[in-house]
Amino acid sequence: MINKIHGKVIEKKESSLVLMTTVFEFELLVSAFCLANFKLSDKVELFTYLYARENELKLFGFLNSDERETFKSLIGVSGIGPRAALRVLSNIRYNDFKEAIDREDVELVSKIKGIGKKMAGKMFLHLQGKLLINNELESSLFGFKELEESIVSMGFDRKIVNSKLKEACDLIEFSNLKDSEKEQFLFKEVLKRMSN
């Protein structure tokens, strides 16, 4: 099984990235959140999942192992195929989806395109208590508490700052930044996201 792919983004499509590795070019179907994180020529590392059926072979790419595990859990739900699972992950971040499932937020989940209340109920039944997040983001935030405090002191809401900081940590998880550069990158990235 292909666990990860390291490569350079040579093409961005509507719902996929084309990566050039040392020898091959791979097209990976990705979530909208994953797609938005990269631009052409970026060097990236994506977790992968190979979906193989008799007449179908598709390679999916993910920001981290948690997003991939959420995808795998979703396709385990009767009636949810890989494209529907990717659509879910394009409409709601995997950690927010886990929270919505755990608290049985029918309204939020059923608003996802192609997921009605009946399918949302099936998801709750199948996934509740089974979506485990590795706390990668939380552990990566541990070293940036001072950064969080400094941004909050600028007058921003702590909850929003924390959320944007988690999003930005998604980016540095697979970046080639040195430790000394990460805080500076996060500071700029969080402020940029706060202003959007």
Swiss-Prot record:
InterPro entries per record: DNA_helicase_Holl-junc_RuvA_I, Hlx-hairpin-Hlx_DNA-bd_motif, NA-bd_OB-fold, RuvA, RuvA_2-like
Record remark: domains: Has three domains with a flexible linker between the domains II and III and assumes an 'L' shape. Domain III is highly mobile and contacts RuvB.
Signal peptide region: none
Keywords, ordered alphabetically: Cytoplasm, DNA damage, DNA recombination, DNA repair, DNA-binding
Region Domain II: start-end pairs: 64-139
Membrane-spanning residues: none
GO cellular component terms, semicolon-separated: cytoplasm; Holliday junction resolvase complex
GO molecular function, one term: four-way junction DNA binding
Protein name per Swiss-Prot or TrEMBL: Holliday junction branch migration complex subunit RuvA
Organism (species): Borrelia garinii subsp. bavariensis (strain ATCC BAA-2496 / DSM 23469 / PBi) (Borreliella bavariensis)
A GO BP entry: DNA repair
Top-rank taxon, per record: Bacteria
Compartments reported by the entry: Cytoplasm
Pfam families: HHH_5, RuvA_N
Subunit record text: Homotetramer. Forms an RuvA(8)-RuvB(12)-Holliday junction (HJ) complex. HJ DNA is sandwiched between 2 RuvA tetramers; dsDNA enters through RuvA and exits via RuvB. An RuvB hexamer assembles on each DNA strand where it exits the tetramer. Each RuvB hexamer is contacted by two RuvA subunits (via domain III) on 2 adjacent RuvB subunits; this complex drives branch migration. In the full resolvosome a probable DNA-RuvA(4)-RuvB(12)-RuvC(2) complex forms which resolves the HJ.
HAMAP family hit by this protein: DNA_HJ_migration_RuvA
